[in-house]
Amino acid sequence: MSKGIVALAMSGGVDSSVSAYILKERGYEVIGIYMDLWRDEREEYCNKSAAEDARRVAEKLDIPFHIINIGKEFKANVIDYFIDEYLSGRTPNPCVACNKTIKFEAFFNAAKEFGADFMATGHYCKIEERNRRKVIVKAEDDKKDQTYMMYNLKQYQLERTIMPCGEYRKEHIREIAENIGLDVYNKKDSQEICFIPDNDHGGFIKRNYKSKVSEGNFVDKAGKIIGKHKGIIYYTIGQRKGLGIALGKPAYVIDINPITNEVVIGDEEDIFHTELIAKDVNFIPFDKLEKSMELEAKVRYSAKPSKATIIPLGNNKVKVVFQNKQRAITKGQSVVLYDKDMLVGGGIIEEIV
């Protein structure tokens, strides 16, 4: 007897491909869906080979396969947001924006149109029930854990979402793929931003918004001009390489001012802080933070969680006070909160205090 119909987001990679197999083995009826997210006039970013890989896997596993176009939503909510943030002197995380608006909203809605009871992805996270609420828990494979990107999910989404890979280590996923004869078993993981295959975000923004990118001044903490920069979109807090200025000592980006078009340069000690304010905060184990809470937090995907006090400020904002100084807290990035293995929530870094 079927456990229900699952619409699986297939990327053509090994994780979503093996997810299809696991779900079938568990008794679900699986529908494979590839999201055609965006292409420019030359179709430079339309990854046809990925779509074909996904189609071949679906045929091998004997599951229905569809391609849906979510390009309009992707451009408005991810690409335009990404560009606007850089032009505003912030450093966005497009994967967080994509999960919030595309994979777990636009795709979630598309899954319902296909008659699915659930949606699934190849993300490395676990969904469990604790205290009568669905929560997100770190994956078995700590190196592949993707909970940092998932803090925006709501209860209604979690109740209908399955992430099979969270229970496996990456090497086991590849082993399963090879054992069942999937050609993608040794396919490399994508490292770049999906709509910027050459990983040159500055070049991408300049091609699309050349008139908004202009040279400006590097200044020191006192406001003294110490050089010329090629445009604020090319810089982020804590950056040392590629500045193109020689000061006789290591120089770091410590602030970006989009109003004056200036990049502020300082010493390494200037990029360490203990406090930040985050906006657009979402919590998963509960709806609202009523009082201060001791948790762990991290300010970038690759960082280790560090002890911090989370203070509610109202208007979906919190203040995060770390016990120890954190390197290069960056506006536009996400601060993500944990209670041991459980994802508590997160928000966008708005201000460094």
From Swiss-Prot:
Its main location: cytoplasm. The record marks 123, 333 as: Interaction with tRNA. InterPro entries: MnmA-like, MnmA-like_C, MnmA-like_central, MnmA-like_central_sf, Rossmann-like_a/b/a_fold. It is an enzyme of class 2 (transferase). Pfam families: tRNA_Me_trans (PF03054), tRNA_Me_trans_C (PF20258), tRNA_Me_trans_M (PF20259). Gene3D superfamilies: Adenine nucleotide alpha hydrolases-like domains (2.30.30.280), HUPs (3.40.50.620), Translation factors (2.40.30.10). Residues 144-146, 300-301 are annotated as: Interaction with tRNA. Disulfide bonds join 98-194. Its EC number is 2.8.1.13. GO terms for molecular function: ATP binding; tRNA binding; tRNA-uridine 2-sulfurtransferase activity. It is found in: Cytoplasm. ATP binds at residues 9-16, 35, 122. GO terms for cellular component: cytoplasm. It catalyses: S-sulfanyl-L-cysteinyl-[protein] + uridine(34) in tRNA + AH2 + ATP = 2-thiouridine(34) in tRNA + L-cysteinyl-[protein] + A + AMP + diphosphate + H(+). The active site is at residues 98, 194. GO terms for biological process: tRNA wobble position uridine thiolation. Keywords: ATP-binding, Cytoplasm, Disulfide bond, Nucleotide-binding, RNA-binding, Transferase, tRNA processing, tRNA-binding. Catalyzes the 2-thiolation of uridine at the wobble position (U34) of tRNA, leading to the formation of s(2)U34. NCBIfam families: PRK00143.1, trmU. Belongs to the MnmA/TRMU family. This is tRNA-specific 2-thiouridylase MnmA 2. It comes from Clostridium botulinum (strain Loch Maree / Type A3). The gene is mnmA2.
